[in-house]
């Protein structure tokens, strides 16, 4: 169904530039944006108009990295650093998804809660369990989401209750890929958990699958300094952590790649990633909660590295991308103050870009209201924020105030032209 949205429309044009269109019309035709108009053109006369006059309308937000299976313990267990946290809390929790009855209950809660947020696209980790992963993908598909979900691969340095043999990991991955072929909007993404949990043989096999099936890849990179030292021991032929992926063409040379965190880059590694089809999934909440560090996002933006924002549930303690936007700004200021005075803070314009168009490009023409982009939009209700300044604020200022003062659920939500909320 073709339609238009009337409201105060704000979206990114580039990293440092936004477009503000007060009391305007955003037109959707066949699931794609036809652009923003001050007056509705005559050729669209008679189409349905959703009247959100006075409400702020922005593109749907893109969560570049989260673990759906960990939502069950979000907000808990923030007392350890990454590797100990995985072993004590995360791996035992993920092992529960072997029981499909448990998985259905947990994923039903997750999908219901995600639906009410501003997130419209995502790249998501499930677990090693095929049945549970397929259930998650099907539920997301039925709800109307678009994005990627990965069956996790791990054949070493994992507890007995959550580990695969190399052959079983490969076999199950191929079976999973075959089982989700009929899904239209939720697509598979290869997901080696991280180098410490995947043998060289498994990485080589996954690389073959990636090339044969033309699949994107997601994993973790340089999140924690102890992890980096461990990778040096496990893969001595790699000069750095980045090269441990690049050896298997998983660093944006063959297909698109998402690398979560990238808190501690190697100087030579930055040169590998720069100008590649690699997106850094910046996860400020998780980086803080697990005491991993503060990623140098200001530098990445100056270097031209692709960056998107992420909640990283459940290392991240929220499902709200608004809070990820806020944290991306505040943590950049802390890093700038303590370490990198030569690199700028992340601005509100840049944070909006990272949460929409910056991450959205991984999915194609996503994250903008320019003509031809997929119609992902959210409507925000600011009326719970009392103020006498409303008439004096720009749309960008209203958005800035919203992310700092309100983390309520969205008022309305559209994904590829379909009204979800």
Residue ranges and their predicted role:
Residues 74-145, 169-183:
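Alpha-helical scaffold segments that flank or form the walls of functional sites
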Residues 74-103, 156-166, 224-254, 327-346:
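Active-site gating loops and adjacent loop-to-helix segments of metal-dependent hydrolytic enzymes
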Residues 1-44:
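N-terminal metal-binding scaffold of metallo-dependent hydrolase/deaminase domains
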Residues 243, 247-256, 297-386:
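His/Asp/Glu-enriched, well-ordered alpha-helical/loop segment
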Residues 14, 374-421:
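C-terminal cap of metal-dependent C-N hydrolases
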Residues 8, 26, 31, 54, ...:
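Divalent metal-coordination and catalytic microenvironments
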Residues 131-263:
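Metal-coordinating catalytic core of metallo-dependent amide/deamination hydrolases
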């Amino acid at each position: 169904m073709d339609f238009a949205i009337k409201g105060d429309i704000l979206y990114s044009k580039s990293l440092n530039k936004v477009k503000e269109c007060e009391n305007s019309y955003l037109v959707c035709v066949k699931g794609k944006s036809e652009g923003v108009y001050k007056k509705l053109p005559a050729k669209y006369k008679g189409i349905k108009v959703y009247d959100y006059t006075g409400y702020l309308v922005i593109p749907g937000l893109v969560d570049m990295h989260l673990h759906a299976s960990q939502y069950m313990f979000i907000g808990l267990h923030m007392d350890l650093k990454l590797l100990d946290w995985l072993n004590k809390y995360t791996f035992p929790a993920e092992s529960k998804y072997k029981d499909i009855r448990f998985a259905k209950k947990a994923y039903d809660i997750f999908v219901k809660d995600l639906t009410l947020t501003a997130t419209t696209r995502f790249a998501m980790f499930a677990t090693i369990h095929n049945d549970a992963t397929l259930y998650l993908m099907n539920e997301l598909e039925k709800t109307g989401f678009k994005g990627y979900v990965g069956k996790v691969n791990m054949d070493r340095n994992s507890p007995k209750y959550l580990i695969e043999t190399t052959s079983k990991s490969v076999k199950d991955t191929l079976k999973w890929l075959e089982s989700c072929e009929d899904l239209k909007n939720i697509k598979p993404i290869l997901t080696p958990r991280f180098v410490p949990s995947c043998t060289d043989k498994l990485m080589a096999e996954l690389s073959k699958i990636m090339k044969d099936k033309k699949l994107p890849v997601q994993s973790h990179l340089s999140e924690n300094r102890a992890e980096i030292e461990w990778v040096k021991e496990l893969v001595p032929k790699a000069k750095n952590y980045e090269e441990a992926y690049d050896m298997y063409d998983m660093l944006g040379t063959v297909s698109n790649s998402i690398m979560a965190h990238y808190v501690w880059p190697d100087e030579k590694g930055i040169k590998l990633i720069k100008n590649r089809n690699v997106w850094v999934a910046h996860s400020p909440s998780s980086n803080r909660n697990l005491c991993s560090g503060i990623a140098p996002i200001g530098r990445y933006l100056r270097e031209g590295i692709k960056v998107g924002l992420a909640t990283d549930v459940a290392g991240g303690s929220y499902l709200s991308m608004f809070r990820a936007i806020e944290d991306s700004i505040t943590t950049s200021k802390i890093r700038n103050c303590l370490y990198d005075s030569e690199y700028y803070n992340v601005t509100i314009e840049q944070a909006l870009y990272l949460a929409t168009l910056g991450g959205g490009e991984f999915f194609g023409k996503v994250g903008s209201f320019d003509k031809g982009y997929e119609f992902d939009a959210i409507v925000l209700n600011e009326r719970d924020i009392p103020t006498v300044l409303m008439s004096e604020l720009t749309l960008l200022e209203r958005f800035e105030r919203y992310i700092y003062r309100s983390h309520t659920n969205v008022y309305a939500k559209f994904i590829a032209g379909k009204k979800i909320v």
